[in-house]
Amino acid sequence: MIEVWPAIDLIDSTSVRLTEGDYETKEAMSRTAEEAIEFYSRYNCVTRIHVIDLIAAKQQTPLETNYIEQLVGLTQLPFEVGGGIRTLETIETYFDKGIQNVIIGTKGIQDPEWLKTVAEKYPGRIYISVDAYIDEIKVNGWLEDTGLNLFDYVQQIDSAPLGGIIYTDISKDGKLEGPNFELTAKLAASTKLPVIASGGIRSKEDLERLEKAGVAVAIVGKAANTQSFWEGLS
């Protein structure tokens, strides 16, 4: 079965979700981050907790470091953290606080050589988050266009010892309408790096389709807060 990494997005140490990455659509989740971690830890298919510091993604510097460290102590599950990570110093600060993996976004898109350097220093522990509206990459909290094509960029980093590529189709994010199956499958076929699907995943059926498409992991946000998503999963 495909692995599930439930997403916890933080603003002011509160678990929230956005729609299409729009900060104006912020809504608090029904469970606190602490309650969510306890709930997710019950399921064998959950192999990691995915945490994003949303304000850091905009302001380009981490703000929730100490709170995330508290969350790490609540479970045996490993954590990966993203949002505003632009320096090796920040990466190592997270590692020192017990975070197993970090997610690089904007900095890695804008500077692929830097991304390769940190991946070589910490092989398998760095993930690149490629956030695109369909296949056009956006950065800085999904607020800025880059003019970069998803597939052209991935070819630049394909040889780096990354943990994987987290692909989010922004047009699907937070809508519970299903991910972009076609483009995600195309991406998985175009790279030797593991592909992690994110954005719009709503059901066990979506997970099964992604697994058939060659996707290694699904990151699930809004749907993971509903009991119905977990029916039939162990």
From Swiss-Prot:
Which Gene Ontology molecular-function terms are recorded? Answer: 1-(5-phosphoribosyl)-5-[(5-phosphoribosylamino)methylideneamino]imidazole-4-carboxamide isomerase activity
Q: Which reaction does it catalyse?
A: 1-(5-phospho-beta-D-ribosyl)-5-[(5-phospho-beta-D-ribosylamino)methylideneamino]imidazole-4-carboxamide = 5-[(5-phospho-1-deoxy-D-ribulos-1-ylimino)methylamino]-1-(5-phospho-beta-D-ribosyl)imidazole-4-carboxamide
Q: Which UniProt keywords apply?
A: Amino-acid biosynthesis, Cytoplasm, Histidine biosynthesis, Isomerase
User: Which CDD domains is this protein grouped with?
Assistant: HisA (cd04732)
Which Gene3D superfamilies does the UniProt entry name for this protein?
A: Aldolase class I
Its pathway, per UniProt, is:
Amino-acid biosynthesis; L-histidine biosynthesis; L-histidine from 5-phospho-alpha-D-ribose 1-diphosphate: step 4/9
Name the UniProt record assigns to this protein: 1-(5-phosphoribosyl)-5-[(5-phosphoribosylamino)methylideneamino] imidazole-4-carboxamide isomerase
Organism, scientific name: Staphylococcus carnosus (strain TM300)
Write the lineage as a comma-separated list.
Answer: Bacteria, Bacillati, Bacillota, Bacilli, Bacillales
Q: Which gene encodes it?
A: hisA
